[in-house]
Structures are given as structure tokens and as C-alpha cells.
UniProtKB/Swiss-Prot annotation:
InterPro entries: FHA_dom, SMAD_FHA_dom_sf, TCF19. Potential transcription factor that may play a role in the regulation of genes involved in cell cycle G1/S transition. May bind to regulatory elements of genes, including the promoter of the transcription factor FOXO1. This is Transcription factor 19-like protein. Gene3D superfamilies: 2.60.200.20.
Amino acid sequence: MLPCFQLLRIGGGRGGDLYTFHPPSKSGCTYGLGCRADLCDVALRPQQEPGLISGVHAELHAELQGDDWRVSLEDHSSQGTLVNNVRLPRGHRLELSDGDLLTFGPQGQAGTSSSSEFYFMFQQVRVKPQDFAAITVPRSKGEAGGGFQPMLPPQGAPQRPLSTLSSAPKATLILNSIGSLSKLQAQPLTFSRGGGRPQGLAIPSQHGEAQVSPAPPTRNRRKSAHKVLAELDDEVSPGPLSVLTEPRKRLRVEKAALIASGE
């Protein structure tokens, strides 16, 4: 038999709701009660007037003392929390005793807590371990239980072990100025416009300054084309001169023959 404490709902015409609490840690924990089911361990959803219960209306703080749990109630609401028909000051903690009557929200229309929708009895009990399936599990495991919680994959989901991940550096694709793709591995490479071999960049020195090797001189295609044309002109130019000089020689010979025949 393990020590636990309970909240038994006895008011509002819906009695019989029972909440059993057994903190999982001996250091204690906190249980939230309110209309926000995503923030509280016990959801108090009013059916008559929704505005009577705050998002986090109150908190139960449990601390282990000897063989039993010491439980105190703290109010965080705007409509109030009553213990034995006495309103608890907001932000004030009150230690509960076995048999105390708790009212969350204002009193009922008749002016008594018994007519309230959320009217509970607090009691200290001992529960067998086989009955722990009905115990309310707290969202907060302790006073300092809030904080980052890692997101874990669901059970049975395939997981890749970290040992299979490759430690080799990943390749990087860079688009250079002339529109070609360069694949870089451990050492970055650059490509010249003339189609030569890739030129490697020097490894940075210890002072963090990179020494870049001078790029090869670019070729001036236009200049080389003019040079070729000039050479062609030199080769072709003697041809027409020889053609023109040959008729002149023949003309002189014919003229000399006519002069000789005229004489």
C-alpha cells in the first residue's frame, strides 16, 4: 500500500468523479487544475458558465513528509477558490487536511459551495500498486519540472545510427563567371577561360591569410587574328607584283623590235 491523495467530486449534480494522485518522485511535484486541458492535469470544464474557471485555476503542491504526502493548495484564478467555504487569497498556499472541502470558482446560486459545479472532497488514502492504472500522471514532474523536453520519434520508427554517418567533407557546386559548374572537394579549384588545367588555390597560412597563385595570362584572340592576317598578306603580296612586271618586260621587247624594224 502506497500513500496517495484524492479529489472526489461531490457537487454540481455530477458527483462520483475521482482523481487519485501519487507523485512519481519523492521530491514532490505540482498538479494544475483549470479549463485549459493542454496546461492542466485535471481539466475543469464548466457546463453552465464557461467564464467561471480560469485557464490554470489552482495548483496542488505535494511534498513527501514521512510516510504521507503534504499537500497545499494555491489559487491562481480571478473567480476564486474556497477551502471549507472560506475564500483562499490569490497566490497564497494553504496546507490541506484529510476531509477538507474544496470549491473551484464562486459559490452556487443558493450561496453554498455544495451547489457549485466544482465541489470536491480532499482525502488521504493508501492505494495498492495494482490500482495505479487509475492514478493521474502529472504534466510537471517537480517544482522545477518545466523546461525543454526533447522530441523523440515514435516507437518502432526506423532510426539511422550515428555511426553510419560519413565524416568525409561534402562536395560543393559553384557557378563561375562563364557559366560552367565546378565541383569542389577538400581543396577549392578554379578553371581558366582558355580550357587549361584547373589551378589550385594555396592553403591558407597559419595567420589566416590565403596566398593565391597568379592566374595564367589571358590570350588576346583578336590580336592573334591580326597577326595571322598580316602573315597572309606577306605571303600573297609577291604574287601580283610578279604578274605585273612580266607584261612590262614583254612590252619593252616588242617596242624595241618595232624601233629596229622602223629603222
